[in-house]
Amino acid sequence: MRAADLGNVPLQFKAKVRIGESEIARRWVPVRLPLWNIVLSGYPASGKTMLARRLVSDNANFVRLSVDDLRGMFYGPVQPPKEEEFVYDQLAALRDLILRSRRSVVLDSTAPRNSTRRFLLNTRVEGVVRLLVVLLVERSELEGRNQERGLVGAVDAWNRTWENPQTNMPVMKFRNNSLAEFETSYYVLTDLLRSKINPYRRRFIAHLFPKIRDAKS
């Protein structure tokens, strides 16, 4: 390949080898990006869809799967609770199909219970890094956002079903009380996704479970 062709090659496939001040060779090293299965969990209006769409927009290797979108595709505006198991089974099948194609997945779901979180996190595809991202918003802010949507009482309703994540789950806290806080949390998350070593190193400890305050407080 000619040197003039280098500009057309993705950056992740370029590697420069230097000795002293002179560049003596260029080696083409295929760098496999980490494969992620990211599950979002949070109250209504906590910013899950906003985060999922941002991840897909900023990362060409990510695909967003939404429980609500899939349910709507099958059943339209009606949401039959008895068919939830079918919806989640189809979601898991789509997730694994995408992961096998070597693309990362972000699952846009409320996932208030640990049983649902475990189901969405677990995959038979090998070499996948799992992460549960819990979006945290103060109760007063949540109530204001839901009132704007016409969902009065949504926070109280979700308080009855919400469970804090188990300590053995790979969890990151994502605080989203304001746009500025969203951007700060997003910076930490993207830094974590690009990490080439164990993501649970010291610099990320402050953003990890178990010290999570939910909307009940």
Sequence positions of predicted segments:
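N-terminal pre-Walker A segment at the start of P-loop NTPase domains
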Residues: 2-28
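Hydrophobic anchor at the beta1->P-loop junction of P-loop NTPases
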Residues: 40
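P-loop (Walker A) phosphate-binding loop of NTP-binding proteins
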Residues: 43
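ATP-binding Walker
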Residues: 46
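Conserved substrate/cofactor phosphate-moiety recognition/catalytic segment
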Residues: 49-103, 143
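Glycine-rich phosphate-binding loop used to anchor ATP phosphates in small-molecule kinases
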Residues: 83-130
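Conserved phosphate-donor/acceptor-positioning beta-strand/loop module used by diverse small-molecule
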Residues: 126-145
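Small-molecule kinase domains that catalyze NTP-dependent phosphoryl transfer to phosphate-bearing small molecules
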Residues: 149-217
